[in-house]
Amino acid sequence: KGGGYIDTPYLILDHEMITALSQAAKRGIDVRILTPHHGDKWYVHGVTRANYWALIDDGVKIYEYTPGFVHAKTFVIDDEYAVVGTINLDYRSLYLHYECAAWLYKTKSVLDVRDDYLETLKVSQKITSADFNTIPWYRKIMFAFLRIFAPLM
């Protein structure tokens, strides 16, 4: 089917979420994640990027929106379901805050959300494993260090 498309400004995942996304991609599901190229908080953006590499190696496609800061929180699954709301993919949204979202099913709006997502990818940069090799070693260490504090973000 359509796969799973995720749009989130903050990608601060726990082990279970990384495993679920990776396993889906390994099974051949088209999993795509879109985050901003320019973050609004440098330390959160660093943790977001630190999560890319394990996902990319397992087949998840990561994109960064380059024209500016994207703050959308949307999920589209198999072109049949969509979620639009305030839920970030971070610890605070998933475990601490009370977030709000609309679940869309059996409505044309699901395809509208999907089409908007696909249009946004056209002005986004696909991130590859090769991109990780261009990051200086000291930034990689900083990303790893920041992941320790991920549950607080």
Task: Enumerate the predicted regions with their spans.
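PLD/PLD-like phosphodiesterase catalytic module centered on the HKD motif
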Residues: G3-Y5, Y10-M153
